[in-house]
Amino acid sequence: MAANRDYYDVLGVSRDASDAEISKAYRKLAKKYHPDLNHEAGAEEKYKEVNEAYEVLHDPQKRQQYDQFGQAGMNGQGGFGGQYGGQGFGGADFGDFGDIFSSFFGGARQQVDPTAPQRGADLDYTMTIDFMDAIKGKTSEISYSRSTTCEVCKGSGAEKGTHPITCDKCGGSGMMTITQRSVLGMIQRQTTCDKCAGSGVIIQHPCHNCHGKGVKTQKQTLQVKVPAGIDNGQQIRLAGQGEAGKNGGPYGDLYIVFRVRPSKDFTRRGQTIYTTVPISFAQATLGDEINVKTVYGDTKLKIPAGTQPNQKFTLKEKGVPSLRGGSTGDQVTTVEIVIPKSINEAQRKALLEFVKASGGSIAPQEKGFFERLKEKLS
């Protein structure tokens, strides 16, 4: 760095700046000018200046000497430039650059005791059921695979009569702290212990039943009670039916997601059931009582005289029961008036009499009566 360049100017801070202000300024400039991040001409030299200035100003003793004597008080120990100048950047390891910045700028991983009890993972299971089973509920048997605690070693992974020992390389933490030299100086970062694979323990005599894993994969069979009123895409939770925990931790849960097959007779929206029934022109005109399908069986529906096309009728409490209990939805039935495609002579004469009695007439050149009736009813 040029001999007349002031370290405070390099970092852009005042001479009475606090340690926190100096560190903040350095972090900002180090990221800005780092050669791996900035390929502009002069960035590498600027980066060296920033590190040299920080090497002095963040050290209370060096800073005091600098404030009193200037660069002459450094005796060639001005930090980064003298320490790494001969090496340059070729010897720096940038393979773990993300880890370096994470550790350097406060992103260190939180330590977790690997030998502490850990809850098992949750599992998902998709269960396909019929439309009517979703309405009324049922009990079904399912089978799936999950890990269970080894019954021989009770989850320790060690042969009966032996115990796991604390890893002598990481001291049981499951992590190793590595100190390495980088372009940012000497830094520390954590990595998984390569001896115990992060478990914190060594199993000298693995269990013959689970081969040291502490768990075994087994087929699980359950009787699942499908709640009445369950809908497509909804799920239920079965506590403790998931994967085995570690170090004595509890089992995870099993989540069952329901897929409901569609019905040819009914559709559903929430707690309401929808259906359509056909009736004749005579039934719509004169009125009638008809049988209507519901999810609970056939029921009677009174069709009043003068019923119009697509008129809706509500059948109370013939819908879907609430999952919470206490209420049942309705069924909405839409009537569809069916016009016959052909009629016999007696029917034709009867309809003509009906038209005359109604004060109308049908001219031969006009559209057919049933065609006009269809248009009117559509």
UniProtKB/Swiss-Prot annotation:
Q: Where are the CXXCXGXG motif repeats?
A: 150-157, 167-174, 193-200, 207-214
Q: Which parts of the sequence bind Zn(2+) 2?
A: 167, 170, 193, 196
Domain of life (superkingdom) = Bacteria
**Zinc finger residue ranges, CR-type:** 137-219
Q: Name the principal localization, coarsely classed.
A: cytoplasm
Q: List the subcellular locations.
A: Cytoplasm
State the HAMAP family in the record: DnaJ
The family line of this record is: Belongs to the DnaJ family.
Q: What does this protein do?
A: Participates actively in the response to hyperosmotic and heat shock by preventing the aggregation of stress-denatured proteins and by disaggregating proteins, also in an autonomous, DnaK-independent fashion. Unfolded proteins bind initially to DnaJ; upon interaction with the DnaJ-bound protein, DnaK hydrolyzes its bound ATP, resulting in the formation of a stable complex. GrpE releases ADP from DnaK; ATP binding to DnaK triggers the release of the substrate protein, thus completing the reaction cycle.
Put simply, this protein is called: Chaperone protein DnaJ
Lineage summary: Bacteria, Bacillati, Bacillota, Bacilli, Lactobacillales
Q: Which gene is annotated as encoding this protein in its UniProt record?
A: dnaJ
